[in-house]
Amino acid sequence: MTTRRTFLGAASSLAFSNLFSPANAADPNKTGAASMYADIVLHNGLITTLDRANPNATAIAVKDGLFMDVGTDRDVMVLAGPDTKIVDLKGKRVLPGLIDNHTHVVRGGLNFNMELRWDGVRSLADAMDMLKRQVAITPAPQWVRVVGGFSEHQFAEKRLPTIDEINAIAPDTPVFLLHLYDRALLNGAALRAVGYTKDTPNPPGGEITRDANGNPTGLLLAKPNAGILYSTLSKGPKLPFEYQVNSTRHFMRELNRLGITGVIDAGGGFQNYPDDYAVIQKLSDEDQLTVRLAYNLFTQKPKEEKQDFLNWTQSVKYKQGNDYFRHNGAGEMLVFSAADFEDFRQPRPDMPP
């Protein structure tokens, strides 16, 4: 049966030019009459092959996620049978699927449906209107979260919202805005939800800004360690498991929309194996992945890295998995001391000026 995954699987393979050689194409004459025809044929297009020996293809035939042929319409259309899905590209360009070699699909997918995106929003007024509308439909105890993807420089006003502006829109719904890796803005409801008070100490490398009376204002700063930002965000409610499955599917669909068909997942903080990989494993087991995903495992405990790695190697081996989901080794850090701090404008406290 032709599926979105079948097509995307072929598209991601397009990035490897040797797959276009005859030795790597499926031969319908060798696979029997029942397998002679393609699942999908794209024709009448402009195919970017990345193959110098075959740079001007106009059609592609795909079966079981593999190329049967890449060439001219005349050559490829003979592989179309009565059940083949035929797509007339009408002269449009087909590009190789993009492979992102550092992203966080496993972690990001769990929360994608909970996040409001300000990517590409041209004015702060529009962004705040989006925030207001999201607050109106967000049920308690969930937060409204804008987790990066924007900068004040994209807004016509050339500034970030103030805490007072956020409080006016959301007096009772927690709001968390992450700006790059240098700061987070929390409204009063979010401060109450996380329990930050005048008695809450600053964590190492982070600052809870305070008013004249010592009460938190809602501005958190990485100075220079962004741990305060991540740890605060992690205090928010999680989605139920089945909602996380749905959220991850939406995240992958967004990646597909942008042309991404393969990723190296870099692990990341607050991402423990195997508990936090249950959702992506379920999607893999059910053949629901629409990106090829090679995942790294990231140590979670400073000074206990060796034990983390020993625990993992007892349950998962390097390259264990399949073409769509496999273990890719350790990363993104091997030891915590290897990490630099994210706010590069701040001096490192452990290094001389």
Which role does the model predict for each range below?
Residues N29-T31:
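N-terminal pre-domain segments of enzymes
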Residues A23-A25:
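Boundary at the C-terminal end of the N-terminal hydrophobic targeting segment
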Residues A10, S35-H43, T48, R52-Q314, ...:
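Divalent metal-binding segments
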Residues M1-A15:
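N-terminal secretory signal peptides and thylakoid transit peptides that target proteins
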Residues Y318-Q320:
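Structural alpha-helical segments in enzyme catalytic/regulatory domains
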